Amino acid sequence: MALYRVFAIDILNKRKDLGCATQLIGVLGKVIYLKFVIAPDSFKGSLTAKEVSIAIKKGITKIYPKADVELVPMADGGEGTVQALTDATKGKFITEMVTDPLGKPVEASYGILGDGHTAVIEMSAASGLQLVDENSRDPMKATTFGTGELILSALDQGVTKIILGIGGSATNDGGAGMAQALGAKLLDPKGNELPLGGGFLDRLDRIDVRGVDPRVKKTKILIASDVTNPLTGKNGASVIFGPQKGATVEMVEQLDQNLKHYTDIIEKDLNLAVKEIPGAGAAGGLGAGLIAFTNSQMKHGIDIVVEYSLLKKRAQGADFVFTGEGGIDHQTKFGKTPYGVAQATKLVAPTAPVIALAGNIGKNIESLYQSDAIDVIFSTPSGAKPLDKAIKDSPQDIELVAENVARLVKTTLAAKE
């Protein structure tokens, strides 16, 4: 009923001036102007945000072949953020050979946005858990050095701002490796530089930042993260995230103590208290390292992507908004793409229904409807099937759901004539 209400009332009664450039001939011969904005996240393990967008567009244009369709592939600051923002702004991709979490060379890519002075980096490209075989994971030795190398590469491109997504790390070094790559010296009592990795931070005696690249402090870094954990303690980086990175119970205890010592030295030598800052524990403490060694600010990932993709501008005049991701549940309200897209587009196109597609719909989604953001959620799989088959069929299934929604739009509009 809600879907019929928003389609019929909002579009036909409230939208007297649809104002879109594409003319569509309705089922009764009346000229109708419709604009569809398509802004999904990726379906992880299946399709990128761009591929999901294309599948939705195919379904819509089967019914409305001349529709004004605006594709805005999205992300929430994690996986896919570089692709989404670089594509959205017609930027370019840069690939560098950097240091992976365990010190081996690895190719990592980042984006330069269309403005030419903003870079977008995912720390996981250089320091991510996916780069380390499950049997080789070692948060005692894992380093964010490669992330620092990507930052330096971006500075060499002449950027003045960096968007840095910090999800999916293999590390627990408090951003120490990143700082070392940028030129900081982490010294033991004998004046020797520490080896890379969070397991050696207990040896830290002093920090010398005189060698840090001077461009670092002149460059604004936006940290895209929704993690609010402090650096240490029962809710800190080591305790909450260490085990998934391979930390044993003993390692967790040592890593947590090492990070506490690390922050004590930061406070002594840099005059900064970072231990309890919300988000300092993100990405194995990289949040703390960025705050300590760079000119940085934390911001919700989806808010950054909404801003830099120009979603609000591109959604002006929208009649329908499609979003989605692989799974939607009650936690989607907390920084996930579908909810962020819905909130943003409602500000500029308040009568446009927001239609979310998901590979899996979880429990307790009623709160998403009650929030006056997402209007309706559809599951995309066409019947029960094995996971590998569901993944393979994702493009066709998404296209079919989008086509059926477009048919419903057309039927509802015809009924109001």
Regions inferred by a protein language model and the residue ranges of each:
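N-terminal loops that bind phosphate or other acidic moieties
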Residues: 33-166, 170-417
